[in-house]
Amino acid sequence: MIVFDNGTRVFINSSTNKDIYVGFSGFGFEKDIGGILGIAHLLEHILISFDASRFVANASTARSYMSFWCTPIRGRATSVDAVRTLISWFFDKDGLKDDFPVSKIKYHIKELENEYYFRNEVFHCMDALTFLANGDLYNGGRLSMLDRLEDIPLILRDRMRTIIGPNVVIFVRELNDVVLSLLANTFGRLPACPLTIPCTVRTIIGGKTIMMPSPFYTVMVRVEPSLHNILSILCLYEIYHLVDYETVDNKLYVTFSFIHEHDYERFLQGSGRLNLTIYKKIRLCYGDDFLMNVYLSFPCIRHDIFDYLTIVNTDTSSMISSLERDIYQSVRTGDYIVVYPNFSNTMSNTADRQLHKTVVINPNIVYASQPTTSIDLMKKQTHNEMYIKYSDAGFIDYVQLALGLRRKIHKHVHGIHIRHQFSADDIKTILESDTFMKYSKSKPAAMYQYLILSFFVSGNTIEDILQHRESVVKLCRTYKNKIVLGKQTRYDIQTLSSFVCGIFKGPSVTSEYLTDIMWKLKRKGLIYSLEFVELQKNMFYLFMFTIYPEDVTTYLSSRKLFTSRCVVVSKKGNTEDFSSMKKDIIIKLR
């Protein structure tokens, strides 16, 4: 680890696939509370800009921090190019960027609204802790920000000026004199302390139960944010599933998720005690995303994570015992947050400005002081890789499992790969639980891309496909048909979602061309993401959720490289109507 004079920390991580990865603590959604929700996320979208033909890059905004990374496409750019590109997002020749014209901001706000729509159609993107801390269930920005468009540049400028050296963490894959000089002359010259200290209002959350869609019964127990408690939680995270942590407003919560309601009840009633045995040596080996989260979330961890190995492996017993005392003291006094699975369409909280269907109540669980049973947690196994074919009957369940557990899904031609550390029995237990099955079926929007794809590539009518939704993925991937695009170039339908999809063909159409189209549509604020799959040579199926379906359709129809196309435009409604979707099936007998 290298520490610049201003407190910026630089770590060399040769195992990462990100050539440069930069995080900023105290720079997330929390900073928007009391002001315009979404400023942090808007700033993320404004800052990141790169040539998609030379680099792969991304950024994310969390509750308490923001992070950015960039890596070159080999043969098209170098590692130093990636470092220069990321630095250019924050610095120009005059120093730290803080001037953002209104003319560009409005398009980013439109993109934020599309991201909000996408995330709430495909995922349950709700933040219970920020909501209870006077934020909202969704804090990523909405179209209503346009009402205060003239105020936003000044707010963005002030937000940028809060960046200080001690809050910056940098991971680099390779460090040489050029990279070190670039970092030292930019991030290394940030102020060591803020020029202004904003007034913050501390929020007392207390004990609450929030009822919202969730695959598990989750309890967030407040504990002291001491170094030993933090290290103890990291130990538990390393060896057990469904154990994690959350931070909000400088408060630390250790989270336990339960598959069965009776385990959750026993834990809060005190009749069951968690088995938190540390049964193997702790290695503190984490992925770069989790490690960045740790460094940014906990200012007390100022050293390299491996400097704490001796402590966690020699003082494990006393550390865990101390954490347990904190946990059960908070459970006794009701200082915890419960996320209780609920999928009802009738419950609504009028204080929720995002109009999500949720309700908040005070917990009424009586604590019994004599534990009589032990609650075992799922142990993490060695790293495994699960391959699920698109034709697998349980394909959608596995996708929902990966999303619910925040696992990355690697897409391939005939299926997906998911890396995990579950035993086969544990996966079976989760997939067969009532709560998970309800959660898996509570977001049907993701299936639309497979429904329409099946219509185009299979010999089935839309009526047949709708009658067999659960097996539609199998229909998508077993075709051997030749697709011929006819005179009808557009179908207008009504579903429970707003999206544009279809088949696009042209001799010069490639995946790179479609990626370029995606970025152009994003810059116009018309979409958040675009999914595509190649069906035949130079013929692709495209799908994108959007709140501007007509604008997206007009843009796609104007692309001259698309010599043939058939577009499906879905208008959102309370009922489904696919009646316009007709096709001819030609059978050749030989």
From Swiss-Prot:
Note describing how the cofactor binds: Binds 1 zinc ion.
EC identifiers of the protein: 3.4.24.-
The keyword Signal is annotated on this UniProt entry: no
Cofactor field: Zn(2+)
Keywords, sorted A to Z: Hydrolase, Metal-binding, Metalloprotease, Protease, Zinc
Pfam families tied to this protein: Peptidase_M44 (PF03410)
Binding site for Zn(2+): H41, H45
Catalytic residue list: E44
A GO BP entry: proteolysis
MF term (GO), any: metalloendopeptidase activity
Homology family: Belongs to the peptidase M44 family.
Known function: Seems to be involved in viral proteins maturation by cleavage at Ala-Gly-|-Xaa motifs.
Name of the protein described by the UniProt record: Probable metalloendopeptidase G1-type
